[in-house]
Structure formats: C-alpha cells, structure tokens
Amino acid sequence: MGQQLLRRFKGYGCSMIGACRVVAYAEDVVVILNSPLGCAHILRDRELERNYQATNAMRGMFNSIGRRIVYTNLTNDDCIYGSGKKLAAAIGLVVELYNPAYILVVNSCMVGIIGDDIEAVAAEAEAACKVPVLAINSFGFMNGAYSNGFKLAVSIILSRFCTIQEKQDDTIVIIAPFEGKHSAAFRTVKQYLCFLGMKKVILFPGAASLEEIKLLCTCRYGIIIDHNNMLATDYEAAAEVLHERLGIQILDYADPAGFKETLSWLGKIHTALQSPESSYKMLREQLKQQYSQIINDFLAVAGKGNTVSIVIRDAKVILNFTWLNELLDDLQIEVEGIYIDRDNAMANGNVLDTLLYDVPRLSSIERFYLTVEEISLRLDGKN
C-alpha cells in the first residue's frame, strides 16, 4: 500500500465532483448543482464543504458558512417536465444574492438522461442577468468518472475566458492540488517564486479568480507540483491543456523532499525562469540560514545523539517521507520507536507503509499500536 499504489486510487468518483474541484477554492464563483438532493449532499456537504472548512482557521473565518454551492433539488416531476425552469430560477436567485463574477452550472446524470438543453438555458440566463454562466455537462457517471468532469470543466473555462495574448515574464501558474491559496504549500512556493522575480502567481485549477483566469494566457511558464497526490494525473492533464491552448511552457521536475533537494529544485526553476542571479543566491542563503536554525533549535532541546519517537495518528493523506533521511543524519539522532494510533489503523497503516519504504532504516524499529491516550502516557513516561 502507501505511496506505491497511490495513483491507483485516483478519482474514480462522480464526474460532478471532478468538475467542482476545478473551482473548489475560488472566491468569486458560485456553483449550481443541477441535480437531485442526493448529489448535492455528496458534493456540497461531504466533499467541497469539508475541504473548505479545513482551511477556515488559516483564513481567520472560523464561523464561515463555507463555499457558495447551491442546488436545484430536481424531483421525479422534473424528469418528465425538464429542469430548465428550476435552473433559470436558481441562476436568477444566485445573481441577486451573491453577485458572482461568473456561475458554473454542473449537471447531473438525471439531466443527461432527460436530455435538457442546459446550454440554451445558461445562454438565456446570462443575457438576462449580465453574468457569465457556464454549463458543464458532466452528467454524473454517464460520460465518465471524476477525471472526465475535471478535464471538461478546465477546457470549458479556458475556452470561455482565455485568448492568446502577449506573454509576461513575471506571471506564472502553479498547477498543483493544493488546498487553496491559503494553504501552507502554496504560500511557501509563492514566496519562493516572488523572491525570484514573479509578480503574479496563479493557482489553477482550484483557486483562481476570474481575473486570474483571464491572466492565464499571459503566463509564459507553468509549474507542476505534488506528483504523489492522488489527483496528480488530473492536474498533469490540465497542464497539457494549458500548454496546447495557451502556449504555456510547463516546468515538470520531480518534487523536492528535504533541504538539499529543495535547493536543487529551486536551481532548476531559477535556470528556467532566467531569474536574477543575485535574487537566487539571496534566496539560497536565506533557506540555508533557516535550516541551520531548525537544526540548532532542535539540538538545543534534545541534544545530539539522543533518541526520538515517531507518532502516526489521524492520518488524512499519504506523504513523501524521504526528507526524513536527511534530517535524521543532520540531527545525528536515532528513532527509538514508532507509535501508531490503533483507532485509525487502516489510514495510519498506509502512512506507515510509505514511511518504511521512504526511510528504510526505520524498518527494524519497534512499533506500538496504542490508543492516543496510551501513546501520550507512554511518551510522558507515566506508563
């Protein structure tokens, strides 16, 4: 299991979820699910809502109502008479309540079965409301799964809002499944790129505003990051579309793991972007100082030659742990035990498999499957 099988479990869900993912963290769009209540529950309350709420603390929005996702609540009668009237009413209500930059109508398999002309409804509503309305005929599983909806939404959005323009050397797009602009991963990469001379860093698919989407055609370069994510194949497909449609040059390097690989990765980016040598050297020096400070701070607390424990609990994603080899060497410490929360054994077990694959020296370390409370007592020396 773990990292080696990760891509096997890429998005085989409904294509509606894939289409919605393209704008999952965008602030200025409203998604209308033209679907029955069941589809809306899965999409709104379980998938996108969960991901968005996870970022609220970073956004300072602890009481946020979440993403602006509405649904038409299609019924059996709508199977007979069509969904057009409900959808038109929903579009009008969304414009009145939210005043979005644009609206994304994501259609369910029910709409595909009855054959509604959703493009015509969207065009008529757009003319009346003066707001762009894009219809995504994802149709659930009728025309494929998650990946198909994702690619379709990317293609339609680019076709509608992007035209070939003069390239700007200081505008770049990040093509990565980061959890929005407020995620630590995006903020870190953006900081590096701005240091190298980028003035506009766009995260697409996923979080770009309409203004940023229109700027995609000015990007000379795009960077693919996070190849180990289960959505990596979908984002690589999006990169191909960006290259073919807009002529964006895609920089696709192996994800860095650890300090030395990060410096090497930044060197490749620096060379490709032809950024100022002085800026690159200054960034390298700053990162070296930060890493040295981390090492010194840890040794000041733990001391050289001491042992540490690794605790795996409440795992949500499978990570790349190869950086741990470098850190253990630089700290000159040994791992005395690996503690796994047994109440979440399956997910934590997948993470453990990846950890042992990436850091072979840990294969012989004793493992303890305990509750969180038992782990705390053991590490506190109380049991």
PLM-predicted stretches and their roles:
Residues M1-N383:
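An N-terminal assembly and electron-transfer interface module characteristic of large anaerobic redox
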